Amino acid sequence: MTALLHELRRNPLLWLLVFVPGVFVAQRLDPDAHTRLFVLSVLAIVPLAALLSHATESVAAKTGDTVGGLLNATLGNLTELVIALAALRSGQYMLVKASIAGAIVTNTLFMLGASFLLGGLKHHVQEFNRISARLQASLLFHATIALLVPSVVRVAESGPPSAFTRQLSLGLSVLLIIVYGLGMLFSLKTHRELFAAAEHEGGDEPPWPIGLALATLAGVTVLVALVSEVFVESVQQAAVSFGMTPAFVGFIVVALVGGAAEMASAFSGARKNRLDLSVGIALGSASQIALFVAPLLVLLSYLIGPTPMDLQFWTGAVVMVLISTLTAALVTNGGRSAWFVGVLVLVVYVIFAMTLYLLPPAAE
């Protein structure tokens, strides 16, 4: 508790935690004030993300950057999963797929590029474990193939999705989950020594006790998920007020807010010259969404969805995911980065965001 109070005094950003109960009070008093709920939920997620960042760094200091990055990605992706489950129950499969594709693109381009930029502005050249980065990029590329196949098959068909497409998506979902499990076994158990993080100078602040850090990770992640539910309920109506298209909302806004906790950890790690942690969070989170979250949602759609969901994405989403994956694989292949590399990656993300923002609704 003393460590938490010290963090509150040290980081003024955490005073925004007052907006967390404010979100639920506002929802209770006026659930139709969507624009107000949208703004409050965003302000509430920011300090929760900062708190989660420090807790994750404390766990990483005790367990190593690989395990710390995996743990942060797992808890951070709970937000995306909760958002998708809410849309899944109501049958909003387009929103589910947009949030999945958007999360992959945001992690591989925005989070990775911003980490390279922020770290490079403070440190001339940074190094990271390229073996771990190559594994995550390879897993992500294989998942992209699984997303591409049903979409290619669908182009050759006419009419509504066939039983073949759904059966193929079901089989691919099981296969992807198996591959993800084997990837974790490879990196965390049988070949763990290949993924050991390089030694870096410690931060200015001592890490929290492991028990407090784990409890904070779990508790704050739950709060982020709850606030994100309020966010997703209000974001569509609020988007109209701000002039945003539905495609931009699902692909960009939901992904940015849902991944805020992971981004805070990745950016902080990059500034402290712990780029292994940043790359592990960005690529680990993206591969986990593609290999675990997406297929899990397909399986859960048979239980809680009005109809089974498939892995058929619209062509533009598949192309963006494929380009993002190839870009991430290219920039992480050498195991070194500088600030200009981050700029180049961010430019690709801005191109996608600009396209989706200006995309006519009829073309989505």
Annotate each language-model stretch with its function:
Residues 1-364:
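Hydrophobic alpha-helical segments, chiefly the membrane-spanning helices
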